[in-house]
Amino acid sequence: MNNLDSSLQAHNKLEKEATNLALLKDRVDKYHDLSTQMSSILTIFEKRLGNLEQTILPVYQETEQLQKRQQNLEATLNCLESVLSHYDVSQEVCQLIHQGPVEGNISVFLDALAKLRDANDYFRHNNSQSVELENVTSLFNTGCEGLSQHYSMLLKKHSAPLKPVELLDLIYIEDDSSDEYTSFRQLSQTTREELYTISHWLEQNLREYTNIYATERGEVVLRSLQLLKDHQKSNSWGHEALRPRHSGRQTEPKKTTSARLQQIFEKKANKLYLRATQTIEQSTGFSIKKASSHSDHLTSEDLMDGDQELDKYLVMLLGLQRLLNWERAIMIDIIPQSKHNEVFATLAYNAIDLVVKDAEAITQRILRCISRKEWTSALGIFSALKRVILLQPDIDRTYDPAQREQLKKVLKKLQHTGAKALEHFLDVVKGESSTNIVGQSNVPKDATVHELTSNTIWFIEHLYDHFDVIGSILAQDVLYSTQLDTILMKKALPVEERNKALLAIYIKKALAELNLSIMNKCEQYNDQATKHLFRLNNIHYILKSLQRSNLIDLVTLAEPECEHSYMEMIRELKASYQKTWSKMLVGIYSLDELPKPVAGKVKDKDRSVLKERFSNFNKDFEEACKIQRGISIPDVILREGIKRDNVEHILPIYNRFYEIYSGVHFSKNPDKYVKYRQHEINAMLSKLFDDSA
């Protein structure tokens, strides 16, 4: 049964496979027929395409040739139109060119110039003998001239010198944003854009415009400075009003011009110090403590010893810097960068020249003042020099090398004037001129401190406020630099201390000449005591002034024994003064030479000796007291010390003489000779140096 089932299954599978094989064979036959048919179709299609290509290709080639002809025709027409436009451009733009450009619509005029330039290029290359070339060239040149005139007109129309008050705002309000002062920006943005467009067109077409711009804007700077200068002459100096910065804001208290200047230069000095500090900290990692700098010496005394003309000049110098910074900012918006240096140099030249010439005039005037012994002008020079030095970083940033060299003349003029002032002051102290520092040749009758001494001390005290600039001036003198080298061989000094040492050398020379002058002047007195007291007054005043102002520490850099020398000189003068009493005391000092009284009596021949001794003492003492009551010793301690020394020196000698001989009967009229008791001598000595006694 199982075998039967297996056979049946095998039979069924065989039949099924036979059926599938027949079906596959049938399909293969059909595929072969289809392939044969497709091959026939493709062969026919290929033949037909070949026939079509043979038909279409000539048409295509003909069409391509027609297209080329059309393109050539269009190009020819365009060329003809272009050529015709070149011939017509003269008539087309003639009226526009002669009318000139219109502000705010410059592009139309520039388009017309572009057409003329193209026509000019065409005729120049294709028909150089054509009359049309002359026409377009003439019109183009006329247009360029009109454009240049329009450029100049725009600059003139929108450029006006700053009013003095506006310029003073720019000077005094250094750190404020310029956006607050849009009224200063006379050239609006649209005007700047138009000027920029014209500048670049003229630059590309090799036309001159830099001189026009530099001349017009340079005139603005120059006129602004001249108006400021006139304003300073006409206005009450030191109280110029500033414009209100913001409406509705409470007005600030008025400051004097000098105070504003001080504030500006203090800011500059602080900026320099901060920049130096940051540099050192970044390079070394160490922080530094603020040392004395320019700003430390820009005190109110600077303003007192300053010269108004110099302060006005500093305002001019600051004004020039602000104006030129302003011009640089404007120039960036108008002039191509490649022309900046050239334009700025021309623009700034006249203004810088004005400032330099003003410096020459001021320094000449100050030299005349110094020749008249007006020493505040000399101190003003040093103050101005200090401030000009503070301006150097701004000058380096603002000006090109040639302009910096031009402005160096200001610095050199001030340095030269300062050197002349120092030199002339020494000459005056030496007494080489016909008059002394106060213009008088007489010494004071009361032998008080001579005005030469007080003025010399006043001057050198004020010099200390400017030791930095004075040191730089003196360093250029080989005599001072040599002495400084000698000091440095003994002791190393930092740069700031070197400037102080140079000033100390100068003060040492001034004091030496002053001492010599005082010594010579004391010879004008006939009385020896007055001579010594005159010198003592002056030497004591010098020493106390040096000690009070701490200048003694400065002078010690150049002369370590200065204080000791003056103290020794005072001691010697006091001793010399005490010796002037010797003539009066010589007759009563040596008791051994006098007759010895016995029971209150002396021999008849000795009476005349005692009369003579008492009489001579009385006469000399009264004469000395009379003279010295008219002498003034201003210093209380010195005056009382000398009185005390006189009492200690004279009274004991007189007392001994008085006690022995006052009771001796050597005259019928003893009161005629024994005129003074001990307390009366003491009272008279206490009234010395007091003319009212």
Curated annotation (Swiss-Prot):
The modification Phosphoserine is found at S236. GO terms for biological process: exocytosis; neurotransmitter secretion; protein transport; synaptic assembly at neuromuscular junction; synaptic vesicle docking; synaptic vesicle targeting; vesicle-mediated transport. Residues 236-259 are annotated as: Disordered. One of its GO terms (molecular function) is phosphatidylinositol-4,5-bisphosphate binding. Belongs to the EXO70 family. Required for exocytosis. Thought to function in intracellular vesicle targeting and docking before SNARE complex formation. This is Exocyst complex component 7. It comes from Drosophila melanogaster. The gene is Exo70.
